[in-house]
């Protein structure tokens, strides 16, 4: 699988699992079959990391200085092993979770060589916290962490040295501890003193590293399969969660619509009953008698009848409007609004401006065609209400998220097949 396809796969997974960038970076590293096993050396500034590396490799590759120089990754390849000198844990521009240090410790490393100077006594809080994280990671990845106590030649009192070792062993009881002196080893090499070389502890540490390196291939296979399994599980669970969310949203959407439609039908039925005394009268409908100039300012029977019709219609509108408000329909959509606020209402949009005659009431509330129109148009404005639009947007977003998760799952399967 080429790098572009791998990156596309990573991007698809990160779009739905944004917190898994570290795990994905490590997985990509493990997918690179030809990469050499990597030993990352971690430790605070001036604890002897670079000097130790030089002795282990057998040549002065890494800079040894009294000032801070390792603020980025320094590496060297030798005998099919890649050595990384990570930024110091207390470097000015690189904290523990700095990008370079994070990459060295969590993405690149197959073996972590944790360096601590015995001159500093026991582990400090930063060192102890990171070691605990590495120990926990070993349970999941089988990557080994080797704790190395350096500069033991600077503690001539063996009793004190033993006390320091014991104290550190109590801090990290799950780790074996290796005590070394790069200075003794260099002096032994330069002066041909075998005893100094043996007492330096470098030989024993090399042997331990050789054993750890022999386990890297199987550890990588285990870790790769574990990461793939974890990602599959997370994606599967996320998809199930999103399906559950979608189901709940759709049920809410359906229930809201059912409640709105049922409530509107009940109100329209009630209005029919309430309007019976108004629309069904014996004799002539006096509301139809037109006004004349002579009766313009008189309270005639025709005006009284029209007033009854208008009051009955207003009461019907109030009942319907109360139902609309209960269900979040409080105004017209923005695209239908005018500059005249008094007519920017759903009632006016559906019914019109005014109803004065009984035939108008009958047409509105007693014909099946008009009733169906009322139900259809009030439902339209219900669906245009803010709450319904937000709910519809959530449903659409959840469905898109499901699609992204499914794409990520397929991409991960393709990556796994290519592994």
Curated annotation (Swiss-Prot):
Keyword field contains Mitochondrion: no
GO cellular component: cytoplasm
Source species, domain of life: Bacteria
Disulfide-bonded cysteines: none
Gene Ontology MF terms: GTP binding
Keyword terms, alphabetized: Aromatic hydrocarbons catabolism
SUPFAM superfamilies for this protein: P-loop containing nucleoside triphosphate hydrolases
UniProt keyword annotation of Nucleotide-binding present: no
One record GO biological process: catabolic process
Protein known as: Uncharacterized protein ACIAD1443
Species for this entry: Acinetobacter baylyi (strain ATCC 33305 / BD413 / ADP1)
Taxonomic path: Bacteria, Pseudomonadati, Pseudomonadota, Gammaproteobacteria, Moraxellales
